[in-house]
Amino acid sequence: MQNDFIDGSLGTKEAVGIVNRVAEVMDSFDGAVICTRDTHFADYLNTSEGRKLPVEHCMEGTKGHALRDEIQKMAEKKQAVVMNKITFGAKNLPEEIEKMTGGVPESIELVGLCTDICVISNAILLKAFYPEVPIFVDASACAGVTPQSHKNALAAMKVCQIDIINE
């Protein structure tokens, strides 16, 4: 959970409201933890995403790109891998999961921002790689661009056989 998505250039009150919950979920999670970071560069506004969302955010090396302090501390405590990603879905996520778990994971749980962009992209990517692995999204530890788009994303993930918990 990066600063720009919480109270920075693309922040929302809903994002602010889940910071402590995400830290709690990370703290109590018994397994490997991976944090993904949206990562953009100076040419962002000239990219496909930048043309459709012309708001600079998560620019590499900025405070907005960094994980929120509470999340960074928890990532350190849990010895999390922090992955930069340049697309909504982290294309190397399955590879990293298998490195950390020594093979196909027993289950996967996702939390964070934004439910309707990155979380859903990663959930569907992981479901494609691991069709028999239970994939959970903790709705109480996610927030979307809007409350309605959060709900829509949860509904879409259910249709794709992703298990939504704590809704």
Question: Where are each of the predicted segments found?
Answer:
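Active-site acidic carboxylates
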Residues: M1-V82, G103, F136, V145, ...
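Short, function-defining helix-loop hinge/capping sites that tune catalysis or transport
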Residues: D7-G8, N46, N92, I120, ...
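Histidine-anchored nucleotide/phosphate-binding helix
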Residues: R21-S28, I120-Y130
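Short beta-strand/turn micro-motifs composed of small residues
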Residues: R37, G112, A139
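Active-site catalytic pocket residues across diverse enzymes, especially alpha/beta-hydrolases
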Residues: A75, I97, T101, Y130
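Conserved N-terminal glycine/acidic-rich loop preference
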Residues: V82-S121, A143-E167
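Short hydrophobic/aromatic-enriched beta-strand-loop microsegments
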Residues: P131-D138
